[in-house]
């Protein structure tokens, strides 16, 4: 985006209810007829990179954004009607409740569009949504008007009206805090009493006789099954709250035919669920507090270690309350947990046992973390990595993640809009992969679009250039390119291939920090270098952490790759090169663990194969789309 261009705060649209597979390119095709677009961003999960189901489309002109809102709202993209509204960055407007109404008892057939069409007669609508789950509409929704007056008109006219033969309730939106406060106030003045655990021989008359002494009752009912047999619970509704409270105080816990009877305030289902959830969360928090700092996570366990052996190894450090090796199908999963009675004992065990060799493997010992803590830690690590990302040297690090937004250069309204070219149509020269498939002929600058990241598939990345004439966006493929070093792990390469590989390896491997002046340019002339011998994994000394740490950083991944490639080649001969390149992105400590643990390696390889297959399927689908023709402005 051109930083000098004027900003239009109301030229940004929120696009919701998106299908998981909708990309920036699809949204550009959809919205570009409305006017010049500055940027498009599909919001994604920070870790998995999966779509969160909504996006932002930033137009150059507010009039174009308004045109898109008026003409494209609820249009179908990949089988789902999308919901469009103005992007409101200030949350205070959304949370204030001004102009927001609540509608319930809706017919299942009423969707977002039908609700919008019904209420748009009362004023300008900012957002409109029917709440749905996997089974469809949940029977209620919300409409947010631009003004409070429009909301009040809608409440006056529509409350109690029939929509699709159902009488709907329309009222002012109330926050959860307001609803809970009202619920608490009503609970203090209850008149309906719930009774259970009184046996099978109870009927309405006996229950009325039992509770009638506390005051006049409006209704008494024992719940029965289809055969008329008591279900063991019932309800008594009193006229006054004082009578109901007295019945609860005196009858709760009273012995009835050898059973302790329960008498309490009758609750709605949502109240019971809320209370049970609160109790569960409290129990969970108590358990977390009790085990905070005393529960240890132990991984890289030898297959022969069981619960008793694990307890025996950690027993010298204190009192163990539990020791468990996680199993699957009768076999160890390679990790377990040890819980001590005090944090001091656990800390001592971590200090002494982390890195110690037990049986045949060095243990990894650390304080156990909850899933939420691990996710927060991973998110923090990811953000730190992203913050340190600079313009990459393609020879050194070809796996940099792409930007998650789709930016268009600012285009003057008088000019025609540039044509859109789908990903893959314009060839991009990229270095060849470091780990090529067996027998492939390497070339230092061949077009290699096959290697991708081992995470979820990334969206295509768009960048633009600004020539003097008509501006045409240049599309860069989201496929990742692999490393340029082309050493193969199979048979000895041909002379030409070996020469090409040697020439690329001879290029100095430098990384530059951002802002460094007079950066040295890479010498593109092939330099004379001695041909490296073929790597033979069999008979090599096992790679250890100390050996890896002693090696220069640029050689560490090569040492790991030399040992990973033959193992992966035995599983997937045709994909070994790509999979090796994908796995080399993982931390070195994890790669060492995979070399020692065949199960862990196979699990990661299976994940990589799944990613490759998903990527190939998406590529094939894209080719089919491209074959139908390229849309132009």
Curated annotation (Swiss-Prot):
Q: Disulfide bonds, which pairs?
A: none
The domain of life is Eukaryota
* One GO molecular-function entry: poly(A) binding
The record's account of tissue expression is: Detected in the adult brain, testis, lung, stomach and heart. Expressed in the epithelial and fiber cells of the lens, and in the epithelial and endothelial cells of the cornea. In the retina, present in the inner but not outer segment of the photoreceptor.
Q: Which family does it belong to?
A: Belongs to the polyadenylate-binding protein type-1 family.
Q: What does this chain do?
A: Binds the poly(A) tail of mRNA. Prevents mRNA deadenylation and confers poly(A) stability. Binds to N6-methyladenosine (m6A)-containing mRNAs. Stimulates the translation of mRNAs to which it is bound, acting, at least in part, with dazl.
Write down what this protein is called.
Answer: Polyadenylate-binding protein 1-A
């Amino acid at each position: 985006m051109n930083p000098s261009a004027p900003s239009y705060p109301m030229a940004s649209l929120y696009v919701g209810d998106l299908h998981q597979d909708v990309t920036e390119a699809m949204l550009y095709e959809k919205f570009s007829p409305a006017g010049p677009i500055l940027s498009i961003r599909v919001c994604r999960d920070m870790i998995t990179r999966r779509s969160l189901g909504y996006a932002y489309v930033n137009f150059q002109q507010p009039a174009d954004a308004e045109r898109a809102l008026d003409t494209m709202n609820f249009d179908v993209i990949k089988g789902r009607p999308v919901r469009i509204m103005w992007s409101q960055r200030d949350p205070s407007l959304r949370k204030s409740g001004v102009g927001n109404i609540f509608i319930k008892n809706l017919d299942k057939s009423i969707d977002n569009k039908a609700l919008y069409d019904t209420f748009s007669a009362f004023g300008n609508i900012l957002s409109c949504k029917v709440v749905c789950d996997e089974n469809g509409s949940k029977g209620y929704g919300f409409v947010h008007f631009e003004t409070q007056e429009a909301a009040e008109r809608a409440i006056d006219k529509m409350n109690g009206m029939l929509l699709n033969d159902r009488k709907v309730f329309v009222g002012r939106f109330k926050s959860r805090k307001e609803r809970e406060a009202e619920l608490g106030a009503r609970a203090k003045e209850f008149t309906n009493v719930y009774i259970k655990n009184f046996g099978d021989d109870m009927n309405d008359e006996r229950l009325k006789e039992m509770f009638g002494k506390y005051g006049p009752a409006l209704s008494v009912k024992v719940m029965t099954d289809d055969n008329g047999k008591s279900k063991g619970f019932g309800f008594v509704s009193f006229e006054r709250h004082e009578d109901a409270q007295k019945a609860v105080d005196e009858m709760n816990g009273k012995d009835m035919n050898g059973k302790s009877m329960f008498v309490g305030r009758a609750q709605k289902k949502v109240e019971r669920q809320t209370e049970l959830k609160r109790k569960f969360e409290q129990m969970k928090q108590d358990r977390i507090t009790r085990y905070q700092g005393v529960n240890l996570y132990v991984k890289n366990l030898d297959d022969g270690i069981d619960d008793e052996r694990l307890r025996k190894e950690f027993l010298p450090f204190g009192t163990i309350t539990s020791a468990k090796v996680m199993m699957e199908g009768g076999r160890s999963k390679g990790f377990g947990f040890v819980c001590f009675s005090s944090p001091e004992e656990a800390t001592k065990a971590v200090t002494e046992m982390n890195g110690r060799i037990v049986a045949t493997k060095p243990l990894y010992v650390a304080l156990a973390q909850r899933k939420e803590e691990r996710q927060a830690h991973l998110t923090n690590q990811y953000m730190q990595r992203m913050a340190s990302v600079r313009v990459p040297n393609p020879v050194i690090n070809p796996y940099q993640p792409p930007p998650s937004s789709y930016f268009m250069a600012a285009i003057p309204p008088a000019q025609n809009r540039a044509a859109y070219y789908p990903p893959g149509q314009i060839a991009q020269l990229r270095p060849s992969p470091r780990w090529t498939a067996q027998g492939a002929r390497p070339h230092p600058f061949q077009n290699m679009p096959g290697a991708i990241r081992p995470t979820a598939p990334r969206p295509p990345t768009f960048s633009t250039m600004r020539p003097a004439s008509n501006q045409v966006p240049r599309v860069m493929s989201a496929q990742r390119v692999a490393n340029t070093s082309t050493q193969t792990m199979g048979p000895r390469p041909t002379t030409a291939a070996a020469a090409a590989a040697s020439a690329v390896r001879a290029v100095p491997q430098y990384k530059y920090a951002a802002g460094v002046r007079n950066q040295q340019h890479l010498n593109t002339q092939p330099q004379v270098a001695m041909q490296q011998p073929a790597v033979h994994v069999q008979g090599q000394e096992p790679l250890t952490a100390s050996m890896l740490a002693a090696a220069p950083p640029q050689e560490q991944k090569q040492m790991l790759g030399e040992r990973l490639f033959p193992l992966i080649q035995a599983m997937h001969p045709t994909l070994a090169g790509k999979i090796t390149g994908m796995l080399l992105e993982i931390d070195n400590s994890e790669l060492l663990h995979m070399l020692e643990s065949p199960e862990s390696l196979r699990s990661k390889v299976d994940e990589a194969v799944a990613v490759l297959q998903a990527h190939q399927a998406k590529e094939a689908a894209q080719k089919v789309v491209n074959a139908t023709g390229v849309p132009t402005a």
